[in-house]
């Protein structure tokens, strides 16, 4: 079996259905003897250029290990799902399990937001009148 990295972009109006789509694709991979090494839901992001007059879309990344038949079936499912605007499949040499740069960026943003919320606001300086 070979290792693949797949990114697919879902129409923003179908964002509520993304968890069900992920689960459907996950069962397709695992039921046929494949394994999922990394699965990341990047959420709704700005597109680099409009696709079908759409400027934002929902991104999902999968790193999987499957046979060619399962990959063909998965790409067929992407092709005939109207909610999937684009998909890209890359062949990788080995399983990638580390968080992607996109997820590292999200975690750092969320950690910064938590730190700012947790840090107490500095007390306002009070002036003392000297007589």
From Swiss-Prot:
Keyword annotations: Ribonucleoprotein, Ribosomal protein, RNA-binding, rRNA-binding
Biased composition (Low complexity): 118-131
Cystine crosslinks: none
Statement: the UniProt record of this protein carries the keyword Cell cycle: no
Name of this chain's protein: Small ribosomal subunit protein bS6
Recorded family membership: Belongs to the bacterial ribosomal protein bS6 family.
Single Gene Ontology BP annotation: translation
Recorded GO CC terms: cytosolic small ribosomal subunit
Signal peptide extent: none
Gene3D superfamilies: 3.30.70.60
Keyword Ribonucleoprotein annotated: yes
Renumbered residue ranges of the record's region Disordered: 96-131
Residue ranges, compositional bias (Basic and acidic residues): 103-117
Function: Binds together with bS18 to 16S ribosomal RNA.
Any GO molecular function: small ribosomal subunit rRNA binding
